[in-house]
């Protein structure tokens, strides 16, 4: 899943993904995808050297998270994945303004440029996540503009303090 959020795909993987009729990844819009890094700034998608899985494990190690038992069939959840979206037409407008977007599979949308409004929308949601869960607990925050509707994937470690144990 992390490879999909970060689009760490080669051409073969990309083509295989698009064989599924429910998928709609536009190669010509992939360059418009971005993520917000730990510094709160916009960066190209996949700019971080470490993958989501590695960053998640590092954060869990920092927190001292341990599964119930190594051989247990039931394990505690260690992260939450949020997908933020909105009205299809409105999110397209935020992303591309009045530019013509062709949503047909295989269409050439290489002329499109990302509009500032989509970056501000993403930053606002990032700020909300940081305030709610803590900036250090945001493992990944990717914005996809290469699918049918623009949306955000946020992976967070929901850290809280237990009243009885204080941990």
Q: What is the predicted function of each stretch?
A:
Residues 1-167:
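N-terminal nicking endonuclease/strand-transfer module with a His-rich metal-binding environment
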């Amino acid at each position: 899943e992390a490879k999909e959020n970060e689009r760490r795909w080669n051409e073969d993987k990309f083509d295989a993904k698009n064989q599924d009729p429910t998928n709609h990844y536009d190669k010509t819009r992939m360059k418009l995808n971005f993520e917000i890094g730990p510094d709160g700034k916009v960066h190209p998608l996949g700019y971080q050297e470490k993958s989501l899985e590695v960053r998640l494990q590092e954060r869990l190690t920092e927190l001292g998270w341990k599964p119930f038992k190594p051989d247990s069939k039931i394990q505690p959840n260690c992260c939450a994945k949020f997908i933020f979206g909105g009205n299809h037409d409105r999110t397209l407008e935020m992303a591309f303004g009045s530019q013509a977007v062709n949503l047909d599979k295989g269409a050439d949308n290489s002329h499109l440029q990302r509009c500032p409004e989509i970056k501000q929308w993403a930053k606002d949601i990032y700020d909300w996540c940081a305030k709610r869960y803590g900036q250090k607990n945001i493992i990944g925050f990717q914005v996809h503009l290469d699918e049918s509707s623009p949306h955000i994937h946020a992976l967070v470690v929901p850290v809280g303090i237990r009243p009885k144990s204080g941990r």
